Amino acid sequence: MDWDEYEEKGLVRKAFVDREHIKSLMKMSQAKLDFAAKQAIDESSSSIILVLYYDALREVCEALAILNGFKVYSHEAFVHFLKYKLSEDEASRIFNRYRRLRNGVNYYGKPVSAGEAAKARSEVPELITHLKEKYLKEFN
């Protein structure tokens, strides 16, 4: 499905730029990053920690969508938003990877390894920093 199809199906809609909502999303994203960074990663915590990192990234993507005048109702649509609206191919790839891992945890009870959570701990904050510095400086 491409971006236009998401719009046609109502999974993405035009929205007004709500600056307070963007600020709130950025604050929640940072809180999740801060909390996740303090947690020890082991086999029993790794899935929970990965989901926290994914949620922090998704909230930044939601803030970006709102800033660009969109309300997104599908996590998968963020993959296309990053790639086709922002031309962020690598960000799109990384987001999609963590989206799939998170879906495995949340919908299928599939655990992720401590190594995957450790990778998220280094990769996700780096990507969030890139997106914030490039697009969301005024909301930091």
Predicted regions and their residues:
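Terminal alpha-helical segments
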Residues: 1-140
